[in-house]
């Protein structure tokens, strides 16, 4: 019972974003939720069930899905085909990483790079939370204040339930003020429903539009896995391995493409729930996945979740996204890396590019590395690439030392 209640908190955290992507692109929200649940179970199978992560609809694919949809007269089946190919590219990348070894990848992601990337993920999400809260700041503040108060003064299991209790408080107040759409209760729709699954179609045009996005979301995946590992206190890049987490993401995305949903990706919102509750049991996320699958088939429950006011979710999201930023800054501080001026430059560069390009992008000014006419590496992905290269240049002496050590080990093995 305890784990089931905790899983509902993760369900609340992922619901808004997972439903928003299909609403923006035209996919069926019920199918998207179903795919999120199936994708999460696939991911946990691939990662030996040790990574407490939840997969939901990816925002990175929105512009290219819309472009593919427009190119095929509104037929999203071709976008599904492109999503499947993107997942296959993910699988190839997973195999390459397994071949060359994670150690050669890991040295390019020291604390000054990883910490700054994590902080950028959280800080870029906070404006979205504030926009949601702006629907009714009073209710948002009450919801946020309730979560903070329970987190500070709560004890034991009650403290772990701070998110779901805060949402309940915000929901009840909104209900009393008449701010909740209760039409789902009187709807004549049947209690159970089968999601409207749809088979994919393939075209070269849709594939060329969508597939290159994996180059951008690969960096986001590393950031998400590093954030998750930092919160839990484990190195998931090393064990179960980046190749396994990528494979899980790839197969989840392929499954979504075949079922008729948007591409899947690991969710920072659920990592923030882990940070707040301090409960890192991966089985709770698997229960959340099962709940999501059931939710996709129960129209009334889905209606209830969709009736939660935007401002209530905005208030909670402020706390969730702030926690992600805190984890990033804590990673930088704990490593003592900023005692080196070169590392300060790296941290600031990543944060300026990551936040600056996202801000300008919202103003219609796109700065980044163009991959295709519709795909540009910008925001976090661009910041990560620049940060990795800058770290390689400024700290090149450390790389030389590591190379000498590797050569010494190789020579000793030959002898």
Where in the sequence are the language-model features?
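Hydrophobic alpha-helical segments within and immediately flanking transmembrane helices
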Residues: 34-42, 56-70, 116, 165, ...
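Short, non-helical or kinked segments that cap or interrupt transmembrane helices
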Residues: 27-32, 49-61, 105-114, 159-164, ...
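Membrane-embedded alpha-helical modules
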Residues: 74-184, 289, 294-403
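Helix-loop-helix hairpins and the membrane-proximal interhelical loops
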Residues: 1-32, 163-243, 369-372, 401-415
């Amino acid at each position: 019972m305890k784990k089931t209640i905790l899983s509902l908190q993760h369900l609340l955290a992922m619901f808004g974003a997972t439903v928003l992507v299909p609403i923006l692109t035209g996919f069926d929200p019920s199918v998207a939720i179903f795919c999120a649940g199936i994708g999460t179970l696939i991911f946990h199978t691939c990662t030996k069930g040790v990574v407490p992560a939840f997969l939901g609809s990816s925002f990175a694919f929105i512009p290219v899905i819309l472009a593919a949809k427009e190119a095929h007269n509104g037929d999203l089946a071709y976008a599904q085909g492109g999503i499947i190919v993107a997942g296959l590219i993910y699988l190839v990348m997973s195999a390459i990483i397994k071949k060359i070894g994670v150690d050669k990848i890991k040295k390019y992601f020291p604390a000054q790079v990883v910490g700054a990337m994590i902080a950028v993920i959280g800080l870029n999400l906070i404006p979205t939370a504030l926009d949601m809260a702006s629907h009714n700041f009073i209710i948002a503040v009450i919801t946020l204040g309730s979560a903070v108060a329970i987190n500070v003064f709560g004890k034991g299991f009650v403290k772990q339930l701070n998110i779901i209790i805060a949402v309940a408080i915000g929901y009840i107040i909104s209900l009393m003020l008449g701010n909740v759409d209760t039409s789902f209760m009187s709807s004549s729709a049947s209690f159970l429903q089968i999601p409207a699954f749809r088979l994919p179609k393939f075209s070269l045009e849709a594939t060329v539009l969508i597939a290159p996005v994996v180059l951008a979301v690969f960096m986001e995946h590393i950031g998400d896995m590093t954030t998750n590992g930092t919160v839990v206190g484990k190195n998931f890049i090393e064990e179960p391995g980046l190749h396994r987490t990528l494979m899980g993401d790839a197969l989840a995305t392929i499954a979504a493409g075949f079922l008729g949903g948007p591409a899947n990706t690991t969710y920072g919102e659920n990592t923030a729930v882990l940070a707040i509750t301090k409960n890192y049991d991966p089985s709770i996320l698997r229960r959340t996945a099962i709940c999501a699958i059931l939710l996709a088939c129960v129209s009334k429950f889905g209606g209830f979740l969709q009736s939660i006011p935007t401002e209530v979710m905005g208030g909670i999201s402020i706390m969730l996204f702030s926690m992600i930023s805190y984890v990033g800054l804590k990673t930088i501080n704990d490593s003592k890396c900023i005692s080196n001026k070169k590392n300060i430059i790296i941290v600031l560069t990543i944060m300026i590019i990551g936040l600056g390009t996202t801000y300008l992008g919202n103003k219609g000014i796109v700065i980044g590395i163009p991959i295709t006419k519709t795909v540009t590496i910008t925001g976090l992905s661009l910041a990560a690439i620049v940060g990795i290269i800058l770290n390689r240049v400024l700290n090149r002496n450390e790389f030389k030392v590591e190379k000498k050590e590797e050569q010494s080990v190789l020579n000793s093995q030959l002898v």
